[in-house]
């Protein structure tokens, strides 16, 4: 039997825009933005009515009111300006002049206001171990500090650091991704390994690699960077080498083979024998999730404002929604970048779940029609409400064929495109030197610093920094 209505609503409020998946996810803005809202509002008779937007920062007690006006065909529009970062709640309300009528309200909707540097920034990707002058040993944070003026003078406002933690010894990779690093006669590795294999006897995600220096050295570097107007981003690789303290202390946090051994990582077609992936739904998963939250907050306290997350598409969506909200509710100034070169719908979902920025397919776009099609998708569809794309011409994992063995003109052209197609752009260190020798077997640079110490000639005559 049909139920009688509990509320005598005489007005209909529907089709509120903008909206992300019928208000399942928040729309995103930055301080100073004007948020423009439209809604279809109508009723069954000719009685006059009015409408407004009620909005507030979630921490505020009272809603503020912004008027709406009739546009056409039952569409109403209004706007309000946001000046503080954090989560906002808003809704549309409509009412008639009849005092007996109860105002009609839409469901509460969510808006997230992120720092301006979530929308605009120029990044310089720094591999700390490659900032020195000796190809046989690691550079230090002091060497990195010596390069700050060079980076600031190029106009960058953000230094993005790859993982700075201790690197595993077991199954350590060698130069050019060789399965095993070279060792001395006692079996000690002679190569640094990959920084994404986090953890050894010196610690894990809360520690720094002793080759780079101490935690105090890092804090000094961070302070010096801030003094130069440079923000710091840190690469968070949620992987553990077999030598990571977690492997012994929390074996339940990992996947296991049928024989009980911890399972190595795979990201088909790639295999990573030097790292273990976390099992995000293990029997003690809440402790794991909280530990990862604490890693982020630890480095935020040390001066990191942006977190570039490695391979987020290989972790569960609910984890990201929980983690980013959990952190932003207490530290709304922190920003997250999704490093997910994967299927489009997967990338869009990560942005909806809360990532402030996303890597893009820019590196593989070459033809005019490809650029037009792709950037229309990012800027002229609903994606603009939740996805902010950052453009890197190259990365340590991607060296496109059109730059292979090419000269300064091609390198300038690609960076010019990156800098004009998005308000977020980045450069991998060495790009300004037009380093152009490709790997014969992969879409990467030969002799990648992912697996070896590397010395760059920052004063090379082909440097295009000017």
Language-model segments: residues:
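Alpha-amylase-like alpha-glycosidases and glucanotransferases acting on alpha-linked glucans and related
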Residues: 195-202, 206-219, 223, 230, ...
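Hydrophobic alpha-helical segments with strong N-terminal bias
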Residues: 27, 109-112, 294, 378-379
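Short beta-strand segments of immunoglobulin-like
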Residues: 23-29
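N-terminal structural segment of carbohydrate-active enzymes
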Residues: 2-15, 30-58, 62-230, 239-241
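Weak global preference for isoleucine
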Residues: 13-16, 27, 37, 41, ...
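A cross-family glycoside hydrolase active-site/sugar-binding cleft signature
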Residues: 125-127, 160-162, 233-237, 310, ...
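Short, solvent-exposed loop/edge segments of extracellular or virion-exposed proteins
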Residues: 16-22
């Amino acid at each position: 039997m049909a139920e009688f209505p509990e509320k005598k609503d005489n007005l209909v409020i529907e089709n509120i825009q903008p909206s992300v998946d019928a208000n399942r996810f928040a729309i995103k803005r930055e301080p100073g933005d004007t948020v423009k809202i439209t809604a279809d509002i109508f009723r069954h008779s000719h009685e006059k009515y009015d409408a407004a937007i009620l909005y507030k920062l979630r921490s505020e007690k009272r809603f503020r009111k912004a008027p709406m006006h009739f546009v056409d065909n039952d569409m109403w529009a209004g706007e309000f300006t946001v000046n503080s970062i954090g989560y906002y709640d808003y809704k549309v309300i409509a009412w008639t002049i009849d005092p007996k009528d109860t105002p009609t309200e839409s469901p509460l909707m969510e808006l997230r206001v992120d720092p301006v540097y979530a929308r605009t920034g120029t990044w310089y990707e720094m591999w700390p171990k490659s900032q020195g002058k000796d190809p046989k040993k690691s550079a230090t944070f002091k060497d990195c500090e010596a390069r700050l003026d060079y980076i600031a003078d190029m106009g960058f406002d953000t230094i993005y650091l790859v993982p700075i933690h201790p690197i595993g010894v077991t199954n350590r990779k060698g130069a050019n991704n060789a399965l095993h690093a070279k060792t001395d006669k006692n079996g000690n590795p002679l190569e640094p390994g990959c920084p994404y294999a986090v953890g050894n006897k010196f610690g894990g995600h809360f520690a720094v690699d002793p080759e780079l220096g101490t935690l105090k050295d890092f804090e000094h570097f961070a302070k010096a960077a801030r003094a130069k107007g440079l923000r710091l981003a840190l690469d968070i690789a949620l992987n553990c080498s077999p030598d990571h303290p977690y492997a012994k202390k929390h074996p339940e946090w990992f996947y296991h083979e049928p024989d009980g051994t911890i399972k190595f990582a795979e990201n088909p077609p790639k295999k990573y024998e030097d790292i273990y992936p976390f099992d995000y739904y293990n029997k003690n998963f809440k402790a794991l999730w909280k530990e990862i939250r604490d890693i982020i907050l630890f480095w935020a306290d040390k001066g990191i404002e942006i977190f570039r997350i490695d391979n987020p598409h290989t972790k569960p969506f609910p984890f990201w929604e929980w983690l980013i909200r959990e952190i932003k509710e207490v530290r709304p100034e922190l920003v997250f970048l999704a490093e997910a070169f994967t299927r489009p719908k997967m990338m869009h979902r990560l942005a909806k779940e809360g990532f402030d920025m996303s890597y893009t397919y820019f590196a593989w776009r070459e033809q005019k029609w490809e650029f037009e099609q792709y950037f229309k998708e990012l800027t002229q569809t609903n994606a603009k409400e939740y996805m902010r794309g950052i453009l890197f011409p190259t990365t340590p994992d991607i060296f496109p064929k059109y730059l292979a063995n090419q000269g300064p003109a091609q390198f300038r052209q690609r960076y010019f495109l990156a800098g004009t197609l998005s308000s977020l752009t980045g450069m991998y260190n060495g790009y300004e030197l037009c380093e152009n020798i490709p790997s014969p077997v992969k879409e990467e640079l030969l002799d990648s610093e992912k697996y070896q110490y590397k010395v760059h000639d920052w004063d090379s005559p082909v440097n295009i920094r000017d």
